């Protein structure tokens, strides 16, 4: 690596918080599993992370992975605290005053599959919060002909591959790098980066064989020390400050909180203030359950009770009255002297998240404050009006409220990572309310955009079905089959569309009759488009008087319809319809310049 990423001054730095992001099945949990040296993944259904967790990886374990004991003194951070969760979910949950709490992120991409929806979502969120991250181009062991070298640094294993295999890896790697450029990130293979502030490092690796994992750890530690020194400084004497990651019911404990402590110290018996939808919760810590090093928060049997924890750490808190606590909300230690001030601060932070809503718009529900913020941000970016935005599952009350909205564009419920209550589901099945649920934010945005387009097309279709459209036709020579009552003539459609029951006019503006019928090859038809030659019955016209062979006639579009055609659905008309309408309007406006304006 060309750029030196070490520091020499000892600082009181806390453990950096690292969020692992990426698409399902691209190897997030396997990567962490390799770093930890435990076998968590193998015990999970489908090898997909099922629960949010946090794992502390001490610096000694990391140095051991790097294989160079001398590095111990070069790295000042005490280790890395990994948050492990599907996609980007924990990243948005881990929030502090609307910002991201994670110090660093890893975006895992399957080098063979490339970018997927949650990959793009992760990048968008990281860009928004300006979080430093490293990209792991995972599953290099699946490149055709790859000779795996267990746990080797990337440079060493790369040298052992044949030129053909090296070429295949470079091709796939630069497809990943190219897509990062498309997303607005300058990127390069990590060992070719000369300035990590300007260029994103991409580490080819295999979470299964361990190849490249030492490099991932090295880059993370280097980034933490080079760019996050100020963020990581803390004082153990400070009262604890953290974020609620998840609210969980536990046997024998009731409601508990999984918390990421990012500043100060939290002790058993401390008074804590926690955000809720109502007034902040004030309670005393009954028990602190901390995972042993290299064990997951989500494996309860591996907890040990501790008397205190110091940032940064993942800890489970047992305390009375936690039922109303919100995932993503702040938790702060308070003393008798500071209680009033802390309650006001926590309430203020929750109030900041209350979304500005209007009298019209969609309803949004999300599972945490952070994901609600992220979801609302994306919809507001697309200028979608929001009537209501709340944390929680979709309830019967939500369903009833949405059903009272008449506009189909806003009779909509959007749910991120939430359930639909059974009574709400029953009600919704009988209603016209549209419901979108997903665990990918931008899929919700895309699905809603698609729905809006469908509704607009449906509305246009209804208009098209009722609107008399422009049409132009010519009476063909030698094709007068009947002179009057009604006149029956052969015509060629020159533009637009001709339909039965439409009035027709000459180029001088005179209305000469109404189309009573159309026939093609002896069959009655309702309409005929440009280029068609058909027989037309015109009631009210007599050939030789009002009309004659080779006359060009137009559908006499009513003024109200002409306004809609010109001002509302003009872009939806075909080219020949537009040309025909333009000529028709010119003819009409010769005598009345303001006609249909």
UniProtKB/Swiss-Prot annotation:
* An annotated GO BP: translational initiation
Q: Pfam families from the entry?
A: GTP_EFTU (PF00009), GTP_EFTU_D2 (PF03144), GTP_EFTU_D4 (PF14578), IF-2 (PF11987)
Please give the residue ranges the record annotates as the region G4: 138-141
Q: Where is this region: G2?
A: 47-51
Q: Which GO terms describe its cellular component?
A: cytoplasm
Homology family: Belongs to the TRAFAC class translation factor GTPase superfamily. Classic translation factor GTPase family. IF-2 subfamily.
Job description of the protein: Function in general translation initiation by promoting the binding of the formylmethionine-tRNA to ribosomes. Seems to function along with eIF-2.
- How is this protein named in the record? Probable translation initiation factor IF-2
What is the source species?
A: Methanosarcina acetivorans (strain ATCC 35395 / DSM 2834 / JCM 12185 / C2A)
Please name the taxonomic classification of the source: Archaea, Methanobacteriati, Methanobacteriota, Stenosarchaea group, Methanomicrobia
